[in-house]
Amino acid sequence: MFASWTPTCYINLGPAYLIDLAHTRYTVQASQDVLLLRNTTVTSHKFGPDNLFTLKFYPGGLEAVLGINQVQFTDRLLPLTQVLPVALLAQLKQPHTFAERVALVEQFLVRAFRRSAHPDHYVRLVHDAIGEYQASGLQLNTSLVAERLFLTSKTINRYFHRVIGTSPSQYFALLRVRTALTAFVADPPAFAPSDYGYYDRSHFAKAVRHVTGQPLPAAKR
């Protein structure tokens, strides 16, 4: 998996496994639940059939719902108990169905969100900026996104570093690659690089290699 800046919780319902975070390898025991920011490439290695229940937050989502800023988690593998209550994790490890686990998580997150006083100003503007970029068909540059939100380029850059941990230009480029690569994998013959702001197939392939480290035919989402 390549970078997405989406805080992701891995609740382990099965055996131990290995996980590579950039150039560091960790062993996650059967009893361990972990959190990754996914600001870099992540590779997992299973010893057998894996059984992971995952929960992924939108960039800035941890802060919007739980009041926890994600920037502190950059390049780290953390115990999930730093984010979710031990009691909730114990419930999720019981022999429930997938739908029952989803319901448990939803109940907890909805209660946590309702306890939040007001949406953070920084988080709201970053989400608005991402929405503007997506609404433009991934075509706008950072300056134009900032202009639509009545912000300066310097201000929007500061907000992205504060909420996500990277610059808006880097995040938008990553979002564009992920979106385009999803479309390419789904239907390669119908894929048109220009639909995603790339000049041609070569330009797209170069972006994919830069983000994934793999040539286009072998790249995975």
Region roles according to the model:
Residues 156:
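Nucleotide/phosphate-binding loop and acidic/charged catalytic motifs
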